[in-house]
């Protein structure tokens, strides 16, 4: 009996560092062995764009010589356009990254990388966001290899429904990683103060302050795993409902007067 060839995956890649980012190029090259790779990414750095979607202006795209597609928009725009109109075929999975810098704890609320994965999940696809820790960004290949392994695992076992994986990888050679840890989000202290300066014309300008230092970073958190040279895998969900608050809210809502 003739064996039927296993169909190859079709992967959609995006990021928030921009279409020319090193991490994106290395990820695309590594994942090409798994199937067809489509890259649709912002035309420039869009870090911190979160889930913003452009609704009040047209979006221009450009087909680059290397086969990637550049979008004059946010990471969410990129994934939305790719899935709903730009790509000729529906992808099987969305992978966002490799981000230059970690997305830990409260970072996920602002991250364009996580938002790109989340948009894929909104549109019904399995989705991963991957970020490289540290500040020097030397070992993108390590993060790419981790993603390669995870995708192979997901192919066999699938993801739980409505789950996004937020993956953070230490900036180390692969051989120096201490393992994989399933983690929860930690938290940071409040952000550093806004920085006020004066421009050359004498007008005040402002810079958003740096992210706050680690606060909740004990065992079980994404911070802890990364600090101990482990890959952090945090399952995220789209449902933001605070179910534990229902009873308390219900008790005082009854006392409201119409």
Swiss-Prot record:
Known function: Nucleotidase that shows phosphatase activity on nucleoside 5'-monophosphates.
Domain of life the protein comes from: Bacteria
EC number(s) on file: 3.1.3.5
GO cellular component terms listed in the entry, alphabetical order: cytoplasm
Subcellular location field: Cytoplasm
Annotated HAMAP family: SurE
Cofactor(s) this protein cannot do without: a divalent metal cation
UniProt name for this protein: 5'-nucleotidase SurE
Gene from which this protein is expressed: surE
Catalytic activity, reaction form: a ribonucleoside 5'-phosphate + H2O = a ribonucleoside + phosphate
NCBIfam families xrefs: PRK00346.1-3, PRK00346.1-4, surE
InterPro entries per record: SurE (IPR030048), SurE-like_Pase/nucleotidase (IPR002828), SurE-like_sf (IPR036523)
GO molecular function: 3'-nucleotidase activity; 5'-nucleotidase activity; exopolyphosphatase activity; metal ion binding; nucleotide binding
Keywords, ordered alphabetically: Cytoplasm, Hydrolase, Metal-binding, Nucleotide-binding
Protein family per UniProt: Belongs to the SurE nucleotidase family.
Organism this protein belongs to: Coxiella burnetii (strain Dugway 5J108-111)
Bound cofactor: record note: Binds 1 divalent metal cation per subunit.
List of residues binding a divalent metal cation: 16-17, 47, 99
Species classification: Bacteria, Pseudomonadati, Pseudomonadota, Gammaproteobacteria, Legionellales
